[in-house]
Amino acid sequence: MFDIHNKPNSDGIVKGVSGNYEQFSQIINELVDNSISNYRAHEDEAGFLPVIDITVTEYDKTVEVFVKDNGTGLRNLDADLTLAGAGCAETVLNEHGFGLKTALSSVDSWTIYTCTKEDVKLGQHKKIFGPYSFEKFKGWLCEGECPDCFCPGTTVRFTCSKAMFQTLKPANRRAKDGFWALIKYLREELGYTYAKVLADREVAISVKGISGDSEDEKEVEPVMPRWEKRIKLPTVKTDLGGGVVEVDCEYGTIIPCRKNAKYYKANLTSSGVEIRVNGRVIECGLYSRIWNEAPHPSQNRFLAQVCITTDKASALPVTHSSKNGFRKGDEKLEALYSWIRKNIQKPEKNNQSLEHRLVACLAAKMEQQPGVLRVSMEEGAYTSIGSKSRIDLFVSAEEKAVIYEAKAHTTRAENLYQLMLYWDGCSMDGKPVDEAVLIAERHPSEVFMLLDQLNSQKDPTGRPYHFRVTTWTEEGVSLPATCA
């Protein structure tokens, strides 16, 4: 027999654990989770609205963040700061025992200030500095009230790089965003993650940004979908394999939310099934794993919200320690997917694009107009040279011929150049038009600027261009397309 010396290296473990959090929002969510968990576990002690105040201050190369709550304070620091110390877990929000330590390992520097009711009576508070360590890890007992935290309560202060802070921006934005835009994204992220918690007034969260002499503080509002059609199921009790849980579910078709940067945009990444546990989102954008097929673009406005309520962690599908998804292969997760398949109607595919349906509605209206002689969708252009180009809509009336280039939502300046090509193609084919219309839900300022410039020019035959922009609403076509 011989000894194996395998004492863990604390620096190596901390570096390994820190890689689990790649997003600034994961760090913030972990700290907010801990505060909410504390409130829920001790709600009988609170005679006030639980509050979480988040302050983000911009510096040259870093941001400094304070996450401050008015909970009970950390009563068992040994357990709270033990990696995998789930024995101190107060609710299912901190079941793993990794979250706080992972969050602290993912930032540049950190400090915890905490004060319990007992500390208040003794006129003291506690302070713990990073870096995290398994040996000779010490805290400081300080006299007086803590200026940086509620008493009782807990504050976590940390700094991180601006590169980490930039991870708040939506994935489709490649350029760096400014500080105030990132603050707005942070509010949206929190409002989405804790939407049902905030809507039920279980807690109030505020985010304050500070940059130089400028400050802006706002309470986080719940980010909720706007339903066009919705089916709400009654609350049901079911056993996923670890005990009975309550399931609330609603699903249907949502209206795209233009004011949001990321959520409920009715696109591929913000549609599908959204699963929450006790009001906190765990995973979203689920479709192919449930129905075993890729979603079709026509299903982008489909949303299903499934909220599981339980105080028993063992009754739930197993989550990642970062709580940003469920672990694949878990039997309780498969049972949940089966419940969803049985109780939620999978959205039907529509192989026609939204643009095609809108143009079809417009064409139907044009056919009813007096003096209209011919209405054609997918009209050929440059046919005289064998081109297969197609114009969205061609309308010939007694007085003039008009062509349409259609976009469902927003146009771009280059769409006008496409329309110009179609105008020239019609002239080449011997069927010159009198007006070319760009139609969409909305048009940015760049389109109007280019419109004026192009309308001052002439086509190759010497005829002046006549371009016009309009909206679906102005033409009496509703979004989403309904041809009633």
Language-model regions, residue ranges each:
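Non-catalytic C-terminal interaction segments of nucleic acid-processing enzymes
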Residues: 461-484
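Conserved beta-strand-loop-beta-strand hairpin that lines the nucleotide-binding pocket
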Residues: 36-91, 132-133
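GHKL-type ATPase core
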Residues: 90-209
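Nucleic-acid nuclease catalytic cores
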Residues: 112-123, 407-408, 424-460, 471-474
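Charged regulatory segments coupled to nucleotide-binding catalytic modules in large multidomain enzymes
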Residues: 232-369, 373-376
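Active-site metal-binding core of divalent-cation-utilizing nuclease and nuclease-like domains
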Residues: 288, 370-399, 410-411, 476-479
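Active-site-adjacent loop/helix micro-motif of nuclease/hydrolase catalytic cores
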Residues: 75-78, 284-286, 410-420, 446-449
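Bergerat-fold GHKL ATPase/HATPase_c domain
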Residues: 1-51, 77-79, 317-323, 330-338
